[in-house]
Amino acid sequence: MEKKTTYHEQKDVENILRLREVLSTLPPFCRDYFRAIDTTTTTKTRISYAYDIRIFFQFLLDENPAFKDYKMTDFTVDVLDQIKALDLEEYQEYLKVYQAGDKTETNGERGLKRKISALRSFYAYYYRREMIETNPTVLIDVPKIHDKSIIRLDTDEVALLLDYIEHCGDQLTGQKRVYYEKNKERDLAIVTLLLGTGIRVSECVGLDIEDVDFKNNGIKVTRKGGNEMVVYFGPEVEKA
């Protein structure tokens, strides 16, 4: 009997193919770095790093006159030694607002920090292996993240939300009413699970039937970063 493929296995295959597609647009020497971090990062992290590093090379093409005649795939590893701390400070400023094709992209504190962290990791790999002589990324400051308050629903707001899901389709007719009735219990169960456990939407999406244990009232979720853990739920979630 053929083994059933889980949601996370399917997504990982999709992400690997997506990563290969992005890597094909980067300078060829970049592949060494991504092979090196394969065992210590998730595929999604590597995809994010690949996009971030591609933005860095696009910045060099767009903003640095020394590379005006280059194409993305023309860059070789020695170009990293030509970049100074001042160039990277200009890159941080560039990241706040820049053009990507027809779109205007922006980055706040978290986006800036992630992109600079990706570049630091990238440089560190080649520097440790003595493929480059300098690492200017250690000379620039990483943007500081200011904590934001977590917005939580109070008891009355939770009750209003669940009541809305349970009755928002009462005035519907025809096919819309049929569709609402078909999915109402599912929607209530999903929202009750999210409210009752605090799991992320992405963690809920990744649940398979085999991950739910009603004997012990627990669900096995795959956390950000790929680690699995059991999250327990109360009677309200069980009844939903």
Positions of the model-derived regions?
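Conserved catalytic core of the tyrosine transesterase superfamily
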Residues: 1-240
